[in-house]
Amino acid sequence: MTRGNQRELARQKNMKKQSDSVKGKRRDDGLSAAARKQRDSEIMQQKQKKANEKKEEPK
């Protein structure tokens, strides 16, 4: 009983999964670099504000 085929199928499945995750991460949303930077900074400011509010919340 050899497991060669099972190993090969698992390898193919993993490669497909890896390529799909890369595709999802590197999506092009049509923004210029400056617009993307501005959008990201606004998101980070909102996250920081939310974190600060949570930190200052009385227990």
Curated annotation (Swiss-Prot):
Belongs to the SERF family. PANTHER family: SMALL EDRK-RICH FACTOR 1 (PTHR13596), SMALL EDRK-RICH FACTOR 2 (PTHR13596:SF2). GO terms for biological process: protein destabilization. Residues 1-30, 50-59 have a biased composition (Basic and acidic residues). Positive regulator of amyloid protein aggregation and proteotoxicity. Induces conformational changes in amyloid proteins, such as HTT, driving them into compact formations preceding the formation of aggregates. Residues 1-59 are annotated as: Disordered. InterPro entries: SERF-like_N, SERF1/2-like. One of its GO terms (cellular component) is cytosol. This is Small EDRK-rich factor 2.
